[in-house]
């Protein structure tokens, strides 16, 4: 079963801003997410995020692309079988998570 993947407008821009090799890796990861976006504790690919420093991300998940140093932060909407991509970016300190927090607040998620 494939889940529907939706993007915040800013996440689309994140994807466009990556170089070609990074974009390929991210698209591959998004394809896996579409197949099984559940948390690892339920046999999926995502890891739960929590509340750290200024980022209040409890209830959201992430996927790490370790080799590329990229992170995808998303929200799982089970009742609609949807994945909402919040941010796609390089993890520099906690910058990607702080940006996710800003977008969550801006979009009222």
Segment roles from a protein language model:
Residues 1-31, 105, 109:
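Arg/Lys-rich, positively charged N-terminal/basic patches that mediate binding to nucleic acids
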Residues 1, 59, 70-72:
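Residue-level marker for the onset of beta-strands and adjacent loop->beta junctions
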Residues 5, 61, 83:
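A broad, low-specificity signal marking well-ordered, structured residues that form hydrophobic/aromatic
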Residues 5, 47-49, 67, 89:
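A general secondary-structure junction signal
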Residues 2, 27, 57, 80-82:
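A structure-centric signal for secondary-structure junctions around beta-strands
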Residues 32-64:
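A short, surface-exposed loop/turn module that caps and links secondary-structure elements
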Residues 10, 55-58, 69:
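Short, conserved clusters of charged catalytic residues that mark active-site
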Residues 13, 64-109:
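Enriched for short, Lys/Arg-rich terminal
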